[in-house]
Regions:
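Non-catalytic alpha-helical scaffolds and adjoining flexible linkers that form interface surfaces
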Residues: 1-204
Length: 204
């Protein structure tokens, strides 16, 4: 009866009850706070919600409690309709994807160079380890390394504008999301990641 009131990205309270625990029961769903209703005419933020819901639906393990990640996701969802800057919301979304990767056991470390331990002049990310690499240690592997955006702790490259930086962030997290999904031998990553790829392409 209340299906029309609830949209993807909304915060709801869900309870399940049954006369006997091993029999079929029913769910009671109450809307706590809407997100989509506040951004209905904002295409990029609707794309963010679509990607958010898509990734959580097939990446997070079923029936596993994720209290800390839930709180981070809740905080992010609340930010979507109130933050005046689309670019800032997109950056927050990329941080959320990093939290998602961490939640499923694929943490990325941008705090120091994986070769030297230096915390300065970080420019790349190793596609193998997910760790940052300093600009002086790329060597002959430079073309194989991923770019570390400025807003994620990378060096501020001359003539690199904010949109380029955000797109590099999208490319970085998408690489590791695909790498994680490859471990499960999904046959059609493009279909599974349709909403996520659409978000990145529409921003581009």
């Amino acid at each position: 009866k209340k299906q029309y009131l609830i949209q993807p990205g909304d915060l709801v309270s869900v309870s399940w009850s049954s006369r006997i625990s091993n029999q079929l029961g029913f769910f009671k769903i109450e809307l706590i706070e809407t997100t989509v209703g506040k951004i209905f005419n904002d295409k990029i933020r609707l794309d963010i919600i679509s990607s958010f819901c898509s990734l959580t639906s097939f990446i997070l393990p079923e029936r596993e409690n994720c209290p800390f990640f839930f709180q981070k996701s809740k905080t992010f969802l609340k930010e979507i309709p109130i933050n005046p800057s689309n670019n800032e919301v997109l950056k927050l979304y990329i941080f959320w994807e990093l939290d998602l990767l961490n939640e499923v056991g694929t943490p990325l470390n941008f705090s120091e160079c994986t070769v030297s331990g230096d915390k300065k002049n970080l420019k790349y990310v190793s596609p193998k380890s997910g760790n940052a690499v300093g600009s002086s240690f790329a060597g002959k592997y430079e073309n194989k390394l991923l770019k570390l955006p400025f807003f994620l702790g990378g060096v501020n490259v001359i003539n690199n504008n904010e949109n380029d930086d955000i797109f590099s962030g999208f490319s970085l997290t998408l690489f590791f999301i695909k790498k994680f999904l490859d471990t499960f031998d999904f046959n059609n990553l493009t279909k599974l990641l349709f909403a996520r790829i659409r978000l990145q392409n529409n921003f581009k």
